[in-house]
Amino acid sequence: MFQGLSPLARDARAWPFEQARVLLARILRLRLSDAERDLASVLIHSGKADEAVRTFPALAKPVILETGYGPSGLPHLGTFGEVARTTMVRNAFRALTDDAIKTRLIAFSDDMDGLRKVPDNIENKQPLIEDLGKPLTVVRDPFGTHDSFGAHNNARLRAFLDGFGFEYEFVSSTDCYKGGLFDETLLTALARFDAIQKVMLPTLGEERRASYSPFLPISPSTGKVLQVPTLERDVDKGTIVFQDEDGSKVEVPVTGGHVKMQWKPDWAMRWTALGVDYEMSGKDLIDSVKASGQICKALGGVPPEGFNYELFLDENSQKISKSKGNGLSMEDWLRYGAPESLSYYMFQSPKSAKKLYFDVIPKATDEYLQQLDAYPKQEPAKQLDNPVWHVHSGRPPQYGSPVSFSLMLNLVSAANASDKEILWGFLSRYIPGATPQSQPLLDRLAGYAINYYEDFVKPSKVFRAPDDKERAAMLDLLGRLKALPSDCQDAELIQNEVFAVGKDHGFDPLRAWFQALYEVLLGQSQGPRFGSFAAIFGLDRTTALIAEKLAV
C-alpha cells in the first residue's frame, strides 16, 4: 500500500511528511556511520529502501512511535487526536521508506500511577475512596467487570482505539515494571540519581525540593504509591531505603515493580527502555518534554523526535477543561459528525490553536467531503498532501457524498424530517438509483444531520417576515421558479434565476438577498447554495414553501 511512494513523499509538504523526514534523519543518524548514512540515503531516496535495509541490518530494527494514556479516566478527544496524528506520521514514514523499514506504534498506559482522586462521574465511589493512593491496576474496579480500575479503563482504551481501526500495540506500565522490562534502566537511574535530581530540583518549589525523589516506592504495608524522600541508596544491591507510612524504615529493590518513577523521570526512563523514536505532546508539556529529554540523556538514551501540538479552545477562546465541561466531548462529535470528519479536523494545522465547539462540525464535515471529492482528480503528488490520504491511511474511499452536510441540514429543516426515511424520499429522487446501501456515507450524514438539526438548529430557529423590497423579490422569484418545469433538478439553472432576481431588485451585496431567503424561508441566517437546496427539496415544494411564507 505504501510501496513506490518514496519519490513523491520526499517532496510532500503535508506536516506528517515533514515529521516523517525528521524521523528518518534520526534513524539514519543514530543507527549508521557517516559513510553508511550517505549510501542509505541515496538508496532510500531512489526508491530502494528495501536494499538499504538488506545492506544495513541496523535498519531492520523497528522504528517506535509512542502515545501515552492516563487510565484514571476514560479515553477522550485528546486521546483520539494524539493517536490519529501519530498514525498519520507513521503512515507518512512508511510511504517515505516504501514500507521497507518496519514501524511500531505503542499505546502506553500509565496504569501503575497511584489513584489521586475519585472521578466525579462514577456512582460506586466507595472502593475507589478506600483504595486512594494505590496503583490503578490494584484499585478495585467499581464496575465489577475487571480485575482492577486500571484494567477496566485499559479495556475501554483498547475498545476505543479498535473501534476507530487504529493499528497499535498496547503496553502496560504495570507489566513493564513488574515483568522486568524496565529493570536495567531503573538500575541505571539509581546509579545516576544525582544527575536526575540536578534536572528536577530546580523545577520544584522549596518545600517540594526537600522531599523529592525520582523513585516512588510501593508501600509493602499499605500497597500505596508513596511520595517520600529516598533516605539511602545502594547501587550495588539495586535498592533504596525509605520511611513507610507506619514510621518504619524499609529497603526495597528498584526493580521488579517495587517502585515506580515520578512522571517526568518515568517518561524519560520509558523512552530509554523502550527505545522510543517519536512522541508528540501538547503545548502544555513543553517544559516537561525538556526535563524528560535531559533525564533521558542522563540515562544514556536519546530523546525521541516529535512536536508540541496546540491545545483546543472553546468558542470563547478558553482552554478546554474536562472539569469545567466546556468544549466538545468525543461522544458529542460522534453524535453529529462522522469519525472521518474528526480525523480531518485533527489533521488541520496541529501547531495552531483551534476552537472546538459544536459549530465546527458541519464545517469540518463539508471540508472533508470537498477534499474527498477532489482526491481522485488530483495528480499523485498532490494526493499525498490531501488530508483524506492521511485520514484514511493512504486509502481514501472511492465515493464520497453527492450532497454536502450543510445542504442536508437545510433539507432536514425544510422537510421537518425526523427520520432518515423521510430524507431518503428526497435523496432518491434527486440522485437516481441512490439507496442507503449504495451511498453509505450519505446515509450516515443523514443521521448526523437529523441529530444536529434537532439539538442545535431547531431550538434556535427564528423566522421573520420579509420587508417590502424582499417580498417583491420573493414574489418575482416565485413566478420565475413556477415557469420552470416542475421536475427541474438543474441546480445551476435554479441558482441563476435566484441570482438574477437579487440583482434585478437591487440587492447589494447579493449576500443580503440570500440571507433574506434563508431567514424568511428556513428561520436561519445562512445555508448552502439555494439552487442546490431547491433542486434536492423539489421545485414544487420550494415554490409551495415560498408561497406559504408570503401568504399568497
From Swiss-Prot:
ATP binds at residue 322. It comes from the Bacteria. A motif ('HIGH' region) lies at residues 71-79. It comes from Caulobacter sp. (strain K31). It holds the Pfam family tRNA-synt_1f. GO terms for molecular function: ATP binding; lysine-tRNA ligase activity; tRNA binding. Its EC number is 6.1.1.6. The gene is lysS. Its main location: cytoplasm. One of its GO terms (biological process) is lysyl-tRNA aminoacylation. Keywords: Aminoacyl-tRNA synthetase, ATP-binding, Cytoplasm, Ligase, Nucleotide-binding, Protein biosynthesis. The keyword ATP-binding applies. This is Lysine--tRNA ligase. InterPro entries: aa-tRNA-synth_I_codon-bd_sub2 (IPR020751), aa-tRNA-synth_I_CS (IPR001412), aa_tRNA-synth_I_cd-bd_sf (IPR008925), Lys-tRNA-ligase (IPR002904), Rossmann-like_a/b/a_fold (IPR014729).
